Each structure stands twice: as C-alpha cells, then as structure tokens.
Amino acid sequence: LGRNKALVRAWPGVVEAAQLIGSDQIQGRCTIAGNLCNASPAADSVPALLAAKAKVVIVGPGGTRRTAVENIVTGPGKTSLGKGEIVKAIVLPDRPAKSGDAYLRFIPRSEMDIAVCSAGVSLTLGTGNVVKQVRVALGAVAPTVVLVPKAARAIVGTRLDDDALMKLTAACEAACSPIDDKRGTVEYRTEVAGVLARRAA
C-alpha cells in the first residue's frame, strides 16, 4: 500500500497502520482484510479503517453486500460474516479538502509486536481551520475496536485548543474497558489510549 502515492497522500494513517502489520514476508502474502477478519481487538488496521469510515464488500453464496467496517468484528476472534462469505474489497471514501488522518500505537518492543493500545483519528477542517468532521477509534482497549463519538464531539467546532483536546482525552479514557495483563494494566492502557488519541488529533 505504501507504494501507492495517491493512497499515501489521501489516507496516510490507513497506510501507516497497514505497514505496521507483521513483517515484510507477512505483508507480501496477507491483506488488511485478513487483519480485519482475524478479529483481534489489537489489530493495527482496524482503528484507522474505522476512523476513515471505510466500507467492506462481502461476497458469498447469497451474492454481494456492502457494510461498514465497524459491523464486521463482533468479538475477539468473531465476525459477522456468514457461512461461505469472504471480504472481497475494502473501500475508502473520497477524501474531502483540508482533511487528514493518523494512526498511533504503543508497543513494548520496536516492531512486530501486538499493540498495548492504539488510536486512529480522521478529521476535516472547515472555514477558519475549525474542525468540521472527525472520527476517533481506539484499539486494544475493549473486546472490539471502539468508535468514540463523544471524543469527536469534544473537538468539532474547535481549533484543537488545549481544552478541547483534554475533553477528547477524557472521552477516550471513559470509553475504555481493557483487559489487565502482562503487557499493560487497565489503568495504564486507559491513560495511554487517551494520550495517543490526543496526539493523533
């Protein structure tokens, strides 16, 4: 994906997320659709795709259907795909002017590790560089990737001033319900998720 210059310009956060999945060998054989359908709460591509408002094209015995990315994963290792269905394509929307996206994750090692928590943000600026539209998604902090509308509402109509960003942070922290394991405590994941979302915005 990183070789597609138009895609990198339009959706740098999605491309960044995809390039963090596995090694070069894995990326040469696998797809971001596979990363989505693996249904891991910590999947790198999913927060970026949710923030981007991506759609998936599904084919199966009943024909072809289209749905939002957030409708695919229903729980850890579980999807809404029916028997015989596969994801044929992931479709990103046209990019409005004055828009950008970003994906950030925290991992204990430098590469090929599972995210302790992650955040994807996509936003569009309006007149006077005021935030017009935004979507915020968090990974590895709940059984599925979480879209956080309250975090988006916290910064719409602002110029990303400190007060607005702190409200976004608080909304992200409130949306977290992570597990407690050797890679991070509940409190740690919750705090870092808010920090990542603020930085991505």
Language-model-detected regions and their locations in the chain:
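C-terminal structural segment of proteins
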Residues: 1-201
